[in-house]
Amino acid sequence: MIETATDVETSPSPLVSAHPAWSCRWCSSQHGVRVLDAGLQSPSDLHPRPSDPAPDPEYPLVMVMCLDCHLVQLESDPTTPEEPRGLEPSALVEQAEAAIKDAEADGYLRPGMRVLEYPSPHGGSWVEQLGRRSLVEVSEGPADLLVDIFGMMHDADQRAALTSRVSQMSPDAILLMQFHTVAAIVRTGFWNALRHGHFAYYSTPVLVRMAAELGLTAITAREYPLYGGTIVLALAKTGSRWGDQGEGVTSLIESEIADGVLEPEAVASLNDSLARSAAGLKRYVSEAKSRSETVAGYSAASRASALIRCGGVTAHDLVAVADASVGLHGRTMPGSRIPIVSPDDLVSARPDKVLLFVPDLLNEVRQALPEIEQNGGRWVLLDPMPREIDSTVSD
């Protein structure tokens, strides 16, 4: 029998030291503790074909906090790097537009500036929008503006990654780093932000300190609602014309420290979030099944795989998971082998409930698939507990 998070007690447990072979991805310290253990999980971008041999490969998925620099990070990752999956959610496009407008208002954008972008496999690129403002994309420095959109977290060697970015900056350059802050991850119980291929999880105080070690000063920080709390931090070389650390940065640092982002015990509350959300998912689909309701899912993202695995949900519970990426159609979710289908196939199935594994997609999918609610179905957000959304269709 596979143990699932539904079997796990939610009472606090003593923190366990990181694996003896672990060393910090920033400071090389070997003093760390495990703050989240998601058990065995498949690689983040694995979507096997129905005919592929089973069982699917699984590896430990563990989050560690360094006790010296407090960087939250992936303990180990034997998987291969993930690859982009194509379609870009509108939530990421909207986030890019909002952040670019703010960067423009802060004086960081000028026509003719040389821009170097460090993208991630998840989309959210700023290149097109910056091009419309007459900024010039380059493939190497020195650059006047460097943009990192959830990019550096994919680098196993964090010090080398940030050092490389600093080396590409002109004397008065700005480095804009967008990241899903640990404060939001803990506050919202977003434990399944943890995944193979995501080597680092930043809090604002830790990232500001990392940057300072390499001669950078945090000038401004802006917060956005994406993923429950996304930060865009503006960094400049210390002593440049941009001046000292901004008051907004200092205020955000103080706020996040008060939230406990430097305290392993506070971050370890994610284990309770995992247990509650996994149990809640299993209970929800079991109750729906007892009412003879058809339940499906939407978004074959890695966070969905982790939640399905921890909840012990199978193809007997979910008839399918729909995804807009054509390359995933005909494949399955790892471990559970739940079929991945097209949005059109989801509509044809006429599900009573559709579990939305990425809540930020709600407005987008409701607009794209009005038939779900028109046919009497309901969207159910997993954020992280199941929450049914009232239908927009009038009786």
Regions found by a protein language model. Give the residues of each.
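N-terminal juxtadomain amphipathic helix
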Residues: 2-3, 7-94, 222
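A short SAM/SAH-binding and catalytic strip from SAM-dependent methyltransferases
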Residues: 143-157, 359
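A solvent-exposed beta-alpha-beta segment
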Residues: 124-127, 284-366, 375
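Conserved beta-strand signature within the Rossmann-like core of class I S-adenosyl-L-methionine
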Residues: 172-180, 378-384
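Flexible, glycine-/basic-rich loop-and-beta segments that form/coincide
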Residues: 228-273
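A short glycine-rich, Lys/Arg-flanked "PGG" loop and its adjoining helix->strand segment in the class I
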Residues: 160-174, 370
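Short, glycine-/aromatic-enriched active-site segment of Class I SAM-dependent methyltransferases
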Residues: 46, 177-200, 204-206
